[in-house]
Amino acid sequence: MAVRKLKPTSPGRRFQTVSSFEEITRSTPERSLTEGLTKKSGRNCYGRVTSRRRGGGHKRLYRIIDFRRDKVGVPAKVAHVEYDPNRSARIALLHYSDGEKRYILAPLGVKQGDVVVAGDSVDIKPGNAMALSRVPVGTIVHNIELYPGKGGQFCRAAGTYAQLVAKEGNYALLRMPSGEVRKVLVTCCATIGQVGNLDHEKISYGKAGRSRWLGRRPKVRGVAMNPIDHPLGGGEGRSSGGRHPVTPWGIPTKGFKTRDKKKASSKLIIKRRGQK
């Protein structure tokens, strides 16, 4: 999981760093666990842009990941740790004792040959999955369900984890990576440990082209646009926009609260991120 710095043979490589990929044990995916991935370019079903600055990028195969960990009581051996172009984390190929194969997010410290299992009476070790009711207070977890049986939705990116800080009745209190403390039902499943590939945050792309390989297009400033395209656009020569910074839809963009005060999940948030 080390980061390798390239020799400055060109301006684009001068500050470029890449992963060493030393934990990768196989370069090709399990074909039965892949499917085609059609590019959306940030468009929704009506063809309208809903996520700006998306498009292009290298062709990818989607790896089908088991976020639910619903194969209870069946031990699985980690056959390979692989690269996944669709996420920042590495993925681990599991060979279950009954012959089935599945991908999971590769936790920190889990390597080829290790055995992991999901269930309510399993050891507290990285890679094992269980309900939050079975996890001791103080343990760090990842791939956390928000609704029982739906599959993990929290803490899936490289290096992320949440800490179980308390249990109150039917709820477990988790400290999220943002610092937010929120309630989650104790019947929700989580995987022990931290997501691997910690050095992902230290990667420097070095040049614009590397962002384009990932399907990320340039970000144009509002003040550089025409008045029809942005509230800050227009003016003679270079202008400051003439008003406080706003989004293309006129919503203040620096410090303005956008969360719905009537949102149902607000009662499950004990401490907002950034609060003392």
Swiss-Prot record:
Which GO cellular component terms are attached? large ribosomal subunit
Composition-biased stretches, type Basic residues, lie in 259-276
Task: Kindly list the biological process annotations in GO that this record carries.
Answer: cytoplasmic translation
Pfam families in the record: Ribosomal_L2, Ribosomal_L2_C
Q: Which region ranges are annotated with the description Disordered?
A: 26-45, 224-276
PROSITE patterns associated with the record: RIBOSOMAL_L2 (PS00467)
List the keywords (alphabetical): Ribonucleoprotein, Ribosomal protein, RNA-binding, rRNA-binding
Presence of keyword rRNA-binding: yes
Q: Name one GO molecular function term.
A: structural constituent of ribosome
Give the signal peptide range.
none
Which InterPro entries has this protein been placed in? NA-bd_OB-fold, Rib_uL2_dom2, Ribosomal_uL2, Ribosomal_uL2_bac/org-type, Ribosomal_uL2_C, Ribosomal_uL2_CS, Ribosomal_uL2_dom3, Ribosomal_uL2_RNA-bd_dom
What does this protein's UniProt record list under function? One of the primary rRNA binding proteins. Required for association of the 30S and 50S subunits to form the 70S ribosome, for tRNA binding and peptide bond formation. It has been suggested to have peptidyltransferase activity; this is somewhat controversial. Makes several contacts with the 16S rRNA in the 70S ribosome.
Which family is it part of?
Belongs to the universal ribosomal protein uL2 family.
Q: How does it assemble?
A: Part of the 50S ribosomal subunit. Forms a bridge to the 30S subunit in the 70S ribosome.
- Its protein name is Large ribosomal subunit protein uL2
Please tell me the species this chain comes from.
Oleidesulfovibrio alaskensis (strain ATCC BAA-1058 / DSM 17464 / G20) (Desulfovibrio alaskensis)
List the top taxonomic levels of the source: Bacteria, Pseudomonadati, Thermodesulfobacteriota, Desulfovibrionia, Desulfovibrionales
State the encoding gene: rplB
